[in-house]
Amino acid sequence: MNICVNSLYRLSTPQFHSLYSEEVSDETLALLIGEVENGNQNCIDLLCNLALRNDNLGHKVEKLLFDLFSGKRSGSPDIDKKINQACLVLHQIANNDITKNNTEWKKLHAPSRLLYMAGSATTDLSKKIEIAHKIMGDQFAQTDQEQVGVENLWCGARMLSSDELAAATQGLAQESPLLSVNYPIGLIHPTTKENILSTQLLEKIAQSGLSHNEVFLVNTGDHWLLCLFYKLAEKIKCLIFNTYYDLNENTKQEIIEAAKIAGISENEDIDFIETNLQNNVPNGCGLFCYHTIQLLSNAGQNDPATTLREFAENFLTLSVEEQTLFNTQTRRQIYEYSLQ
């Protein structure tokens, strides 16, 4: 027994048995996690079983597995696929006649990181849709362009919805006191033709005033872009970060008119950074908005325009494989906020 446990899990027999007790020592957990990070499938299976627990340890382990799956935490090159398969096996067990009503398996019957990873792994479209329904419920598009159909949940070319983008960016804003991030909006109201960015700026100024770094996520109809108002040398500047083709002149003019409300009177104080970054990140405008906020929150006193211009230039130097990996991992990291 000792030899078997040690060869499979690199744990002593007492350490292995302790995994099924109420308290698991930090040392035992660290040993198991180390093996998981190295891609030990037996340990991955074991850790996924621990993640089923509905206590603090279960939630901690589930989060760690998702961090490895989403690339937030580094592991072996194929770690996400191994975690995927382990979660899929658990999902299949959770839905057999014996266990389907067992509360110990509830994380695989309700929105959770484990269920999301299982859905990512299955190639059965009907199962994928069934799992997506459990995760998303009945969602409705806020604009005609939003793709909220459950069959697209794991699609690598799916446009992010307002709610997904809001959940993720508000989560980032809570982690960074340097940024104020507003709920995503459309630029122009579809029926009244009202400039919604202007309205949101007026409301923000009336309620609390603009912060030193005020972020607005704006949808121009079928595309997300980031609009940042910030102070540089005591002067208010406006920065538009657009990761697709150049905006048309009407759209630019609507943004310029809105910027006047923030106190910007000269066009030289409005900077449009426009670079197509989506060749290998299809419909990735929302992903870049999210990542941009991450960059800005870590930029300190650096000029935001310089930070984002350098990011765009550097991103285009990445290989196709690296850009594709960015697409996959960022989508997973963003959706995690909707699972909390």
Curated annotation (Swiss-Prot):
Highest taxon of source: Bacteria
Catalytic-site annotation from UniProt: H223, C285 (nucleophile)
Predominant cellular place of this UniProt entry's protein: secreted
Where found? Secreted; Host cytoplasm
| GO biological process, alphabetically ordered | proteolysis
Q: Which gene encodes it?
A: sseL
Q: What is this protein called?
A: Deubiquitinase SseL
Q: Which Gene Ontology CC terms are recorded?
A: extracellular region; host cell cytoplasm
Q: Which organism is it from?
A: Salmonella paratyphi A (strain ATCC 9150 / SARB42)
- According to the record, the signal peptide region is none
Q: Which family does it belong to?
A: Belongs to the peptidase C79 family.
Gene Ontology MF term list: cysteine-type peptidase activity
Q: What is its EC number?
A: 3.4.22.-
Q: Which Pfam families does the entry link to?
A: ElaD-SseL-like_C (PF22102), ElaD_SseL-like_N (PF22103)
Q: Which UniProt keywords apply?
A: Host cytoplasm, Hydrolase, Protease, Secreted, Thiol protease, Virulence
Primary role: Effector proteins function to alter host cell physiology and promote bacterial survival in host tissues. This protease targets the host cell ubiquitin pathway by acting as a deubiquitinase in infected host cells.
